[in-house]
């Protein structure tokens, strides 16, 4: 989340991924004012004729929120309410409108801030990592931001393999891979290169001569392409090279819960009902949730539950379904937690 404080009641934010959109959903409430860019049909009324269907134009509005909802399938946050201000004189104040917020959309929020709400927006997402899984046959490039994994591209080298002795120039393939990785890197991102054989080192050396972050070369990943990317995100090599990241922390919590379960300890919870009871007792130390929580509890109940758990001092982490971590939490009821004590 790109975050900037405007004044004591207003902030400007740009969500970067679905984790950020859900953080906004947890913060924005009825009565808050949200300003952003949107489209609206402007109808021309003519005497003795029906109004036409109107031309859809882009305007800036300030909306007093009445309802908020997530549309996970389309990756957007919908904010419905009444227009308080508009950049168009043809849009009447007080008329109803829905503002759709996608990743990359800039909005400003004006409200009476509750405890921890600003921190929730500032801390959403975490550092970004560009992951490159390469060998002599293919190169997979992805960007991991928080726990959201976005596959960027997969390049094929055109190598005939070991069975056929032909002259193959790997230089052009590596040049294309370095260029594609450079396009994926955003400000503040780290760059991690891995894969079988020595190709990863050749690519990392080539990247060092470009305006890119210093690439970290990781060993122990035996696959390239998309398979290599997904193998890396659930490996010990990921935790070593990304220690302190949100993804590494989520994987540590999942493994801690599984270890506690194997020892038949009472200091963990799985599923919405069990974890909600632990939250009501103030027992939660760290909590990981996935999209499955919304399916199990309902959207508003999930938001209230997470906000209440955070108010007791629990560490809250989302696990996106684009990664193995999110799928594992889905399979465990949509939410898991380590506990300070048995409730």
Swiss-Prot record:
Q: Principal localization? A: cytoplasm
GO cellular component terms, A-Z: cytoplasm
Cofactor or coenzyme needed? a divalent metal cation
Task: Report the EC code(s) recorded for this entry.
Answer: 3.1.-.-
Its annotated compartments are:
Cytoplasm
Q: Which GO terms describe its biological process?
A: nonfunctional rRNA decay; nuclear-transcribed mRNA catabolic process, no-go decay; nuclear-transcribed mRNA catabolic process, non-stop decay; ribosome disassembly; RNA surveillance
Provide the alphabetized UniProt keywords.
Answer: Cytoplasm, Endonuclease, Hydrolase, Metal-binding, Nuclease
Q: Name one GO molecular function term.
A: metal ion binding
Q: Does the keyword Hydrolase apply?
A: yes
Pfam families linked to this entry: eRF1_1, eRF1_3
Assembly and interactions?
Monomer.
Similarity-based family: Belongs to the eukaryotic release factor 1 family. Pelota subfamily.
Its domain description in UniProt is: The N-terminal domain has the RNA-binding Sm fold. It harbors the endoribonuclease activity.
Report the function annotation for this chain: May function in recognizing stalled ribosomes, interact with stem-loop structures in stalled mRNA molecules, and effect endonucleolytic cleavage of the mRNA. May play a role in the release non-functional ribosomes and degradation of damaged mRNAs. Has endoribonuclease activity.
Q: What is the protein name given in its UniProt record?
A: Protein pelota homolog
Q: Origin organism of this chain?
A: Cenarchaeum symbiosum (strain A)
Per the UniProt record, the lineage of the source organism begins with: Archaea, Nitrososphaerota, Candidatus Cenarchaeales, Candidatus Cenarchaeaceae, Candidatus Cenarchaeum
């Amino acid at each position: 989340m790109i975050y900037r404080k405007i004044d004591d009641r207003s902030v400007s934010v740009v969500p970067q991924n679905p984790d950020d959109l859900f953080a906004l959903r947890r913060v924005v409430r009825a009565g808050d004012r949200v300003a952003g860019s949107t489209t609206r049909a402007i109808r021309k009324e003519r005497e003795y004729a029906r109004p036409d269907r109107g031309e859809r134009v882009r305007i800036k509005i300030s909306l007093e929120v009445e309802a908020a909802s997530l549309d996970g399938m389309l990756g957007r946050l919908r904010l419905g309410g009444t227009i308080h201000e508009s950049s168009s004189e043809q849009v009447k104040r007080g008329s109803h409108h829905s503002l759709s917020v996608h990743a990359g959309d800039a909005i400003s929020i004006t409200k009476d801030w509750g405890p921890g709400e600003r921190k929730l927006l500032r801390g959403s997402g975490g550092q970004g990592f560009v992951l490159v899984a390469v060998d002599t046959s293919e190169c997979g490039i992805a960007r991991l931001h928080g726990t959201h994994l976005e596959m960027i591209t997969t390049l094929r080298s055109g190598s005939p393999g070991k069975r056929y002795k032909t002259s193959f120039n790997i230089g052009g393939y590596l040049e294309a891979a370095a260029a594609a990785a450079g396009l994926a890197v955003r400000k503040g991102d780290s760059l991690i290169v891995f894969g079988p054989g020595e190709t990863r080192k050749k690519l990392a050396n080539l990247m060092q001569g470009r305006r890119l972050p210093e690439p970290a070369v990781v060993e122990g990943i035996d696959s390239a392409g998309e398979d290599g990317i997904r193998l890396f995100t659930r490996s010990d090599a990921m935790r070593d090279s990304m220690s302190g990241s949100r993804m590494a922390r989520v994987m540590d919590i999942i493994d801690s819960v599984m270890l506690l379960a194997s020892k038949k300890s009472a200091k963990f919870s799985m599923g919405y009902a069990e974890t909600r009871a632990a939250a009501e007792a103030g027992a939660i130390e760290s909590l990981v949730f996935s999209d499955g929580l919304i399916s199990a509890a309902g959207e508003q109940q999930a938001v209230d539950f997470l906000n209440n758990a955070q108010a007791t001092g629990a560490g809250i982490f989302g696990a996106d379904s684009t990664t193995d971590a999110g799928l594992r939490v889905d399979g465990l009821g949509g939410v898991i937690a380590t506990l300070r004590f048995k409730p």
